[in-house]
Amino acid sequence: MSLTTPDKAQVLADALPWLTALNGKIVVVKYGGNAMTDDRLKAAFAADMVFLRNCGIHPVVVHGGGPQISAMLKKLGIAGDFKGGFRVTTPEVLEVARMVLFGQVGRELVNLINAYGPYAVGITGEDAHLFTAVRRTVMVDGVATDIGLVGDVERVNTDAVLDLIDAGRIPVVSTIAPDTAGLVYNINADTAAAALAEALGAEKLLMLTDVEGLYTDWPDRGSLVNQINSDALAELLPTLEEGMVPKIEACLRAIDGGVPSAHVIDGRVEHCVLVELFTNEGAGTKVVRS
């Protein structure tokens, strides 16, 4: 059922408190999942970023590219594997990831946003020393496990991103970054988004997923929560499914780093970012400091 004109006006008026609270603030959005594979959702996400920008909010997009990387690896006949929720990255896999993230996924999103005007600029963690990486391991069945050329973010230099924001642009960040010796790593986009949100002093970190939010007792659909504090979330972490772990670790990192709230939202919902930021119902789970 379509809204009447007064109803549409009321929707806009109802959003005013949130628009006021976020005016001039930075919101880091991790773009991934179905939202980056479905054409309708991709277009809606791009429109959401432009909406935020034109309302005086500063969106910064950090994107993944898991499905696209997997598809390219398959096309090239290169084996792929995951451990602890992270992609095992050999030198061959890294070259594919580098090509796909910046040359395909990032370019597509930049073009979708720029259909509305000269807003988006794509950069990588390699540009202007944005990210300095350090090699990481992951815990698999309680054992620290090497996963190849996969890095964590050791340092963030926000100068380039802040320059883009000051120029009225929307940074679109691909998460490939070198260490201090110049060896390049693939950084999980969830991890990178949290580190960037912390370094920028962002007001919010939004994580797009393919679920309705956080379930405290999956697969019990009744265990979906709309808000949880960081202590309760940390206790829940060992029970979560492997694919959700990097996202929840990222939320906790952001909260511990001073970001007021992190949000795990359903990227399958059209305009999910606007729904989460500007409605009472939201589109997922809000994480706050204990």
UniProtKB/Swiss-Prot annotation:
<keyword id="KW-0418">Kinase</keyword>
<feature type="binding site">
    <location>
        <position position="186"/>
    </location>
    <ligand>
        <name>substrate</name>
    </ligand>
</feature>
<dbReference type="InterPro" id="IPR037528">
    <property type="entry name" value="ArgB"/>
</dbReference>
<keyword id="KW-0963">Cytoplasm</keyword>
<dbReference type="GO" id="GO:0003991">
    <property type="term" value="F:acetylglutamate kinase activity"/>
</dbReference>
<keyword id="KW-0028">Amino-acid biosynthesis</keyword>
<keyword id="KW-0547">Nucleotide-binding</keyword>
<comment type="similarity">
    <text>Belongs to the acetylglutamate kinase family. ArgB subfamily.</text>
</comment>
<dbReference type="InterPro" id="IPR001057">
    <property type="entry name" value="Glu/AcGlu_kinase"/>
</dbReference>
<feature type="site" description="Transition state stabilizer">
    <location>
        <position position="247"/>
    </location>
</feature>
<keyword id="KW-0808">Transferase</keyword>
<protein>
    <recommendedName>
        <fullName>Acetylglutamate kinase</fullName>
        <ecNumber>2.7.2.8</ecNumber>
    </recommendedName>
</protein>
<dbReference type="Pfam" id="PF00696">
    <property type="entry name" value="AA_kinase"/>
</dbReference>
<comment type="function">
    <text>Catalyzes the ATP-dependent phosphorylation of N-acetyl-L-glutamate.</text>
</comment>
<dbReference type="GO" id="GO:0006526">
    <property type="term" value="P:L-arginine biosynthetic process"/>
</dbReference>
<dbReference type="InterPro" id="IPR036393">
    <property type="entry name" value="AceGlu_kinase-like_sf"/>
</dbReference>
<feature type="binding site">
    <location>
        <begin position="65"/>
        <end position="66"/>
    </location>
    <ligand>
        <name>substrate</name>
    </ligand>
</feature>
<dbReference type="GO" id="GO:0005737">
    <property type="term" value="C:cytoplasm"/>
</dbReference>
<feature type="site" description="Transition state stabilizer">
    <location>
        <position position="30"/>
    </location>
</feature>
<dbReference type="InterPro" id="IPR004662">
    <property type="entry name" value="AcgluKinase_fam"/>
</dbReference>
<comment type="pathway">
    <text>Amino-acid biosynthesis; L-arginine biosynthesis; N(2)-acetyl-L-ornithine from L-glutamate: step 2/4.</text>
</comment>
<feature type="binding site">
    <location>
        <position position="87"/>
    </location>
    <ligand>
        <name>substrate</name>
    </ligand>
</feature>
<keyword id="KW-0055">Arginine biosynthesis</keyword>
<keyword id="KW-0067">ATP-binding</keyword>
<dbReference type="InterPro" id="IPR001048">
    <property type="entry name" value="Asp/Glu/Uridylate_kinase"/>
</dbReference>
<dbReference type="GO" id="GO:0042450">
    <property type="term" value="P:arginine biosynthetic process via ornithine"/>
</dbReference>
<dbReference type="GO" id="GO:0005524">
    <property type="term" value="F:ATP binding"/>
</dbReference>
<dbReference type="InterPro" id="IPR041727">
    <property type="entry name" value="NAGK-C"/>
</dbReference>
